[in-house]
Amino acid sequence: MNPLALIMITTTIILGTVIVMMSSHWLLVWIGFEMNMLAVIPVLMKRHNPRAVEAATKYFLTQATASMLLMLAVVTNLLYSGQWTVANMTNPLASTVMTLALAMKLGLSPFHFWVPEVTQGVPLLSGLILLTWQKLAPLSVLYQTSPSLNLNLLLAMATVSVAVGGWGGLNQTQLRKILAYSSIAHMGWMTIILTYNPTLTLLNLLLYILMTATTFMLFMSNSSTTTLMLSHSWNKSPVAATSVLIIMLSLGGLPPLSGFLPKWMIIQELTKNESIFLPTLMAMMALLSLYFYMRLTYSTSLTLFPSTNNMKMKWQLEDTKRTPLLSPLIVMSTLALPLAPILSTLN
């Protein structure tokens, strides 16, 4: 990509997200969403192949539909209340439509259909941007409007998202699809606690971005996109392969790794609000995600993955890409659990 075009695209993506996060006026929020969407499409189409074009088209159509629903909610609220303020979403119909629009942008179930397909069709770096940075703007709007959200609708979508994220990841061999379904499940965990304790949503988002970014960077350093390629990365970089497997278990929420921390605190907060059935159901469905991560760990580290005899193997003689940020990211992605006593004081 042309360096000048890359600078312009990167600046527009960052600026669009910052405008959404810093604005209290609905028109500026909508403009920020559009800037961000139009700038990220060239990033998704960087490969110039039919699969990438198809993924970018699916992303564009989904995000455009969500933006249309968001504008419908804003205009409906304006007609009833006369307010353009983000925090002043008082009309129930407008609040419901806005929740559906932001759920579509985030990839919450039942609007999750685009996330695995788009992530699978783009390069690893584009998938990293799609599953981390692109979640910031919709979640910031949900955070600002959390007191006026439709609670029952949000809880239903969050619970189904955790279930879909667990079931969808089973029997997957493509690493990008596995991370896409993991993203759907994590979005469910973030939104289910949003109306009870928004601070926990921010904590979960921070740890999710750390773990997902670290996993994608390790995949890029190993040039791994499938389970088979990941199992052969032991020859090339044993330390990186071990780190991938530990971080994947952390993504699944296995104690005592970092990924267990937000799930533990969310279940605790839901229990404090006299909700027993919901956290029990969420914990049981989280076992699905943990299962396919543990199965992936087993198939790539404890056994030899099935492969043909004439397949090219990776060796340490090959040059590995230098990623100086990986070391601190790996530490934060796996060893954040001791911070739990400090974080438990958050209100």
From Swiss-Prot:
It catalyses: a ubiquinone + NADH + 5 H(+)(in) = a ubiquinol + NAD(+) + 4 H(+)(out). InterPro entries: Complex_I_Subunit_2, NADH_DH_su2_C, NADH_UbQ_OxRdtase_chain2, ND/Mrp_TM. Keywords: Electron transport, Membrane, Mitochondrion, Mitochondrion inner membrane, NAD, Respiratory chain, Translocase, Transmembrane, Transmembrane helix, Transport, Ubiquinone. Its EC number is 7.1.1.2. One of its GO terms (molecular function) is NADH dehydrogenase (ubiquinone) activity. It holds the Pfam family Proton_antipo_M. GO terms for biological process: mitochondrial electron transport, NADH to ubiquinone; mitochondrial respiratory chain complex I assembly. It is found in: Mitochondrion inner membrane. Disulfide bonds: none annotated. It is a multi-pass membrane protein. The chain crosses the membrane at residues 4-21, 26-44, 59-79, 93-115, 149-169, 178-198, 200-220, 241-261, 274-294, 323-343. One of its GO terms (cellular component) is mitochondrial inner membrane. Core subunit of the mitochondrial membrane respiratory chain NADH dehydrogenase (Complex I) which catalyzes electron transfer from NADH through the respiratory chain, using ubiquinone as an electron acceptor. Essential for the catalytic activity and assembly of complex I. Belongs to the complex I subunit 2 family. Core subunit of respiratory chain NADH dehydrogenase (Complex I) which is composed of 45 different subunits. Interacts with TMEM242. This is NADH-ubiquinone oxidoreductase chain 2. It comes from Cardioderma cor. The gene is MT-ND2.
